[in-house]
From Swiss-Prot:
It comes from Escherichia coli O127:H6 (strain E2348/69 / EPEC). The active site is at residue 246. One of its GO terms (molecular function) is magnesium ion binding. Pfam families: SelO. This is Protein nucleotidyltransferase YdiU. Keywords: ATP-binding, Magnesium, Manganese, Metal-binding, Nucleotide-binding, Nucleotidyltransferase, Transferase.
Amino acid sequence: MTLSFITRWRDELPETYTALSPTPLNNARLIWHNTELANTLSIPSSLFKNGAGVWGGENLLPGMSPLAQVYSGHQFGVWAGQLGDGRGILLGEQLLADGTTMDWHLKGAGLTPYSRMGDGRAVLRSTIRESLASEAMHYLGIPTTRALSIVTSDSPVYRETVESGAMLMRVAPSHLRFGHFEHFYYRREPEKVRQLADFAIRHYWSHLDDEEDKYRLWFTDVVARTASLIAQWQTVGFAHGVMNTDNMSLLGLTLDYGPFGFLDDYEPGFICNHSDHQGRYSFDNQPAVALWNLQRLAQTLSPFVAVDALNEALDSYQQVLLTHYGQRMRQKLGFMTEQKEDNALLNELFSLMARERSDYTRTFRMLSLTEQHSAASPLRDEFIDRAAFDDWFARYRVRLQQDEVTDSERQQLMQSVNPALVLRNWLAQRAIEAAEKGDMTELHRLHEALRNPFSDRDDDYVSRPPDWGKRLEVSCSS
């Protein structure tokens, strides 16, 4: 089957990019590819059998027209000016059978005009982390970019140490970022901001294109998508680590996996990025940061969208966030209905977990085994202050009995939203260290496991992290 690529971005937004081709690596070789995703995109298996090929930027497929995008942004709350694709190249937009499109974005593809002081490369460590994280999030049901392939090489890349140069093929319906809009707003080119908005609506919100107030409706949906995404992050204990405006997806996708981390111990102020000295992007601050980022996006639209309309959309953020978060947390607790005491029970559990530094994922997974008429709980042994747990658990069981469902029905619901497996940093690190020695077994094994996060397991993928695996320091270095 011949893949079809179109050039909407190149043709319709000529001032938002520089056309250029990838720069191949030395002795590049394909070490992993996503068979399930490749099948979904109707990619012939033969493309994965001819060396690095397109996956390593050594050749292009018919119809591809590679380019690096320019955008700007606020980083850690400070205007950073022009940024852009410093190491990535958008190879093309694949046209799928249903009429939708999928960007093919090659990360680590070499120098671009937007590389600033960088070398345009990515390292094996960071490409493995992003591939694992994006696929883990996908199978958790959270909107995200996807990973299609990883190529490693003999090219040295200099970071804190010398590492192997690598490339990641990332795919997404769009790489539109808040930062694209900021770039032209701060260049005082509002007509180009409007062109971006029209492009987004025409291709991704086409049902709004003929509406008189399409910009208000569109921005309201961007707010809702962002609020929903952040709510989902919070419910699974995911910390992004670098929520700069240039890393915010207009479509509400999880984008740009760098120093991310899933909670091990329940620590509301968890900071996964060791460069985040002020804790701006701490786990519990993510909802507020996302709203701040939306406010920056709204500012770029103010030359052609009424400020009252923008503020009305922004005002809807908190309610959308709380609605999505509340619904999912009730499911995680096994509540089939909404009762007035639900929030108090959840907050009391969180307080107990924070005091005891309980494992976030294991706590909710073990809670899924609760039988409403049994005072015994396997979760009890996870707590030191068992009297406090017993007090909470007794009230929790009373609450469960208000919903007229069987234990098996409730447990089935809870186990479908409380994962047994999340991508803990130590699991990724173990796969990385093996891969850096040439052994890809753990990389493939972990990828396969992450496809079934809600299935029970009896291996160390679902155990508490070892001492060396806690508080692993992760930076933006990639």
